[in-house]
């Protein structure tokens, strides 16, 4: 396995670790509605950071975006909005299925759809079937799916042992939302594929290869922001017991603390895709769609490890922890299989 591929896998791991940790600051926010908290974090992660970093990277910010016609930008934006819909459905999936089953089904579907639909759309799926490296990477995808399933099972055992139940368990509604979440969340993978002309244009301007994907985030995350912020603002305006005015009428120190914690959560959320771009840049071009598989499987891996570090499994018993450990090992094996496949 080449150093470039190894570093690509490593950066995807770092990005996934940030994704697994990003909600920790949000949990410390007090006396704010979820909608206000999510909006403040989202403004940082989907608007302020992408625009600021792109402005720092590009020699002429407006000229760069002005060179693309609508036929290039619109698919990137719409796939970003598609991914934003997946974000909203993610929370509802947890509500009706519980954390473990919800995460397992949603992540499993988005891993498969986001990874395999891209080569199918591009007409490159035969590379996966008819080449040794392609078959090995395809094997890695399915091994990762098995790993996700094992971690999901560990979570179910933990929830059963600790008496944790879904907020409003509804299997039919939850499964429908999980499938929708999995499909729509793959929009980020499709957006990255659609944004290749933007990456190439950034490279032509002399932007470092590690950073060429970052300017496209202005458009991708703009689509996600439209959906997420629109959803939050509508709820804040329509739902009787929600009020942004009340949220900002708290004691000044608490408001400042909530803003800083929400902003930190937004920063950590953004960093997952900052390092995703670094990892994506190191993956061989013919296998660039494998970035999504690496990110999502590492997200599950890191989520389990973070849970252990935060002692969320302390009272779960030995069996759930053993099953979790097995799932994490399987995901690590899957990443190595994919890496070897890309190198062959």
UniProtKB/Swiss-Prot annotation:
Gene Ontology molecular function: rhamnose transmembrane transporter activity; symporter activity
Catalytic activity: L-rhamnopyranose(in) + H(+)(in) = L-rhamnopyranose(out) + H(+)(out)
UniProt-recorded name of the protein: L-rhamnose-proton symporter
GO CC, any one term: plasma membrane
Keyword list, A-Z: Cell inner membrane, Cell membrane, Membrane, Sugar transport, Symport, Transmembrane, Transmembrane helix, Transport
Similarity remark: Belongs to the L-rhamnose transporter (TC 2.A.7.6) family.
Signal peptide limits: none
Lineage: superkingdom: Bacteria
Major localization class: membrane
TM regions (residue ranges): 4-24, 38-58, 68-88, 101-121, 137-157, 175-195, 214-234, 259-279, 290-310, 321-341
InterPro entries linked to this entry: L-rhamnose-proton_sym_RhaT
Function, in words: Uptake of L-rhamnose across the cytoplasmic membrane with the concomitant transport of protons into the cell (symport system).
Coiled coil: none
Organism of derivation: Salmonella typhimurium (strain LT2 / SGSC1412 / ATCC 700720)
UniProt subcellular location: Cell inner membrane
């Amino acid at each position: 396995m080449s150093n470039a591929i190894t570093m690509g896998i490593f950066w995807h791991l770092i990005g996934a670790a940030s994704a697994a940790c990003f909600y920790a600051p949000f949990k410390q926010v007090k006396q704010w509605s979820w909608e206000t908290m999510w909006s403040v974090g989202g403004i940082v992660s989907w608007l302020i950071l992408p625009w600021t970093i792109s402005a720092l990277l590009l020699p002429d910010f407006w000229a760069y975006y002005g060179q693309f016609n609508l036929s290039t930008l619109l698919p990137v934006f719409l796939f970003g909005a598609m991914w934003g819909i997946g974000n909203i459905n993610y929370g509802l999936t947890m509500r009706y299925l519980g954390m473990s089953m919800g995460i397992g089904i949603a992540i499993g579907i988005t891993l498969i759809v986001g990874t395999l639909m891209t080569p199918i759309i591009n007409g490159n799926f035969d590379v996966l079937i008819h080449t040794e490296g392609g078959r090995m990477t395809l094997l890695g995808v399915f091994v990762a799916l098995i790993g996700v399933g094992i971690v999901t099972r560990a979570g179910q055992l933990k929830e059963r042992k600790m008496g944790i139940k879904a907020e409003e368990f509804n299997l039919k509604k939850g499964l429908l939302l999980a499938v929708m979440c999995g499909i729509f969340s793959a929009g980020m993978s499709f957006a990255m594929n659609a944004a290749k002309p933007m990456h190439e244009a950034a490279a032509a301007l002399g932007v470092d290869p590690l950073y060429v994907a970052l300017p496209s985030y202005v458009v991708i995350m703009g689509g996600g922001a439209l959906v997420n912020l629109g959803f939050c603002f509508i709820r804040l305006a329509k739902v009787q017991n929600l009020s942004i005015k009340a949220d900002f009428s708290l004691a000044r120190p608490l408001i400042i603390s909530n803003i800083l914690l929400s902003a930190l959560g937004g920063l950590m959320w953004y960093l997952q895709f900052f390092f995703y771009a670094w990892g994506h840049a190191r993956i061989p071009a013919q296998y660039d769609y494998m970035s999504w598989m690496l990110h999502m499987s590492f997200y599950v891996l890191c989520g389990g490890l973070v849970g252990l570090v935060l002692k969320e499994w302390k009272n779960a018993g030995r069996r759930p922890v053993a099953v979790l450990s097995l799932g994490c090992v399987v995901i690590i094996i899957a990443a190595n299989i994919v890496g070897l496949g890309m190198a062959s």
